[in-house]
Amino acid sequence: MPDKVRIDVNQLQVGMAVVELDRPWIDTPFLLQGFTISTQSDIRALQEHCEYVYIDPSISKIDKKPNKKPDKNKPGYFNKLFMARDEPVVTTPVEKEVKQAAVIHNKANSMVKHCMDDIVLGNAINEEKVKENVGETVESIVRNPDAMMWLTRLQNKDDVASQHSVNSCILSVAFGRYIGLPNIELEKLAIGALMHDIGKLQVPTEILNKPGPLSEEEVKLVKNHPAASRNLLMSAGSYFAPAVDIAFSHHERIDGSGYPRGLAGHSLTPFSRMVAIIDVYDVMTTEQVYREELPPFEALKYLNLNKGKLFDQQLVALFIKMIGVFPVGSIVELTNGQIGIVITSNRDDNLRPKVLLMLDNNKMPMKREVINLARNAVDFLGRPVKIAKTLRKGDYGIDQQQLINEGIQFTVLN
């Protein structure tokens, strides 16, 4: 274990490798645990939030002339991006945004399938179509992330590959928005998340869809897809440059146990760390040929158990907070017996989101109304209404795809 040295924040210099703070990282605006100071802004931020820190002299590189153009792959750069930024305000209610989001979502799935067809046929990826859809997706999520996140809960067994690409893009942009990334960075993240798995097109379909265990040779073929994705994106043009590292590194792990290069720690860029988390979350919560989908809380539990080992600890904590206890799209039963769908998360109180009521306490269709559990909703006896449990997809015949296709009409109660 390398020696660490305690140092007053007023003595910090550019090039010092900060490995520990005088308080929990989660209580500060710094995204990643441990980073090398690259600018005077990093120093000022540490001085604002800490009294002292611990540095590792063995990896510190003191430079009296700070780099005026910090490396965007280094944690310090991204910590500065997230400094003193709050999650943007929602500008469009979910019931309005979801209609437009559904159109964008359908276009995205269609566009990804066309891209996949082009790649298989050896044609160039349609850059303009990708750029248009990425821009529309980012704009929708910036207006209201819950609408697009709701759509990730809808599943089509016939389009698992394109669906995973689109879901990963949506979740990544929503995550980037949540931690305060500016729109220009959200678009770069979106490109990488959308294209991170295109190398799987070079893996035989019968292997990808094999319900049983893979042979050693088949595992090797599957594990080659990050390198295949990188090669495809490197030849696709400069617009796809931000996607190259994300595609190549999304199966790497913080402890070095991932593939294809066995990278660890700060060798992994922030975007690749983010997409690594989201890739696993979406795969776990989507039905696969080899297993049923898992409920979101099981996927979040897995991420939480492996934070600091396989996944970035700080990012996992933030991702779990963003997704919440009852993710958007969850079908829930309330303590008064009514059945509804979570349509808006509550970042300040994860246990009390907004719920679109679908069935009354007798499990019969009722007037569609939205109840805000955070506003002290009560039943007819004056008892607080809470979520009693989460139900499985399709329980009581609730079809969310049909609901969205028909257009959502409801009354907001409180």
Specify the residue positions occupied by each region the protein language model found.
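Histidine- and acidic-residue-rich, metal-dependent catalytic cores
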Residues: 98-414
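Membrane-cytosol interface segments
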Residues: 1-125, 381, 387-414
